[in-house]
Amino acid sequence: MNSLDIISIDALYNSGSFTSLDPKAPLLYGSIGFDAKQSYIIKGVIPENSFVSIYGPSGSFKSFLALDWACHIASGMNWDGHKVKKGSVLYVAGEGGIGVSQRVRAWEIHHSGKELSNLARLSAPVFPADGDQVKNILTYCEEIESTTGYPVKLIILDTLARCYGGNDENSSRDMGAFIQGCDQIKLLTGASVLIVHHTGKNIANGARGSSALPAALDVEFQ
């Protein structure tokens, strides 16, 4: 069941607090749940309802890979031999421009003209640390599902820097607010959230910014 069926956007608007929306987690005893299996959007690559990041230096094809995943999910086509669960995708192109639409069209042509009607794009950043922006994302997801008939399975924020506002990437407090916003998006939509992120000046040191981010991720790709 889609999380939007459980927690309405009206409830979100009226609550005044995101944390109060978290449903009470059930108590589990002993080894209950030991045999639960992880479900995937892309088998063995992107788990369902997960927080994922791709990071690397400029020009390392991070966005190219993220968009390729998006296209395969929107089409339901297997990706590199991995089974794919078809669904809608929201791609937030925070850097704007027409590059994303051109890449999508190239993908369609390469795959025999297959139209990606389940792939929705925003050509402007959104800021998960801002509660009002989270509401906007939820509204977009409802609209996308209504239009396509498929729930949003993946939300891509490209890039973290563009969707971070004026906050300090090195601040654990600011990064914590960003992470909390992404968690709320996951909770209320049931989608996975994928962040496209940069390395710092020293590539060997990994992704740029606070270590709170990698600690919060379910999967990280370099």
Give the location of each predicted region.
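Active-site catalytic microenvironments for nucleophilic, acid-base chemistry
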Residues: 72-76
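N-terminal pre-Walker A segment at the start of P-loop NTPase domains
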Residues: 12-41
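Pre-Walker A (Motif I) flank of P-loop NTPase domains
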Residues: 48-52, 87-88
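Interdomain "pre-motor" coupling segment immediately N-terminal to P-loop NTPase/helicase cores
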Residues: 1-14
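Conserved inter-motif catalytic segment of the P-loop NTP-binding fold
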Residues: 36-37, 41-42, 58-60, 78, ...
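Phosphate-binding/switch region of NTP-binding enzymes
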Residues: 53-54, 59, 63-64, 90, ...
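Hydrophobic positions on the alpha1 helix immediately C-terminal to the Walker A/P-loop
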Residues: 65, 69
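Short amphipathic alpha-helix starts
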Residues: 45-50, 192
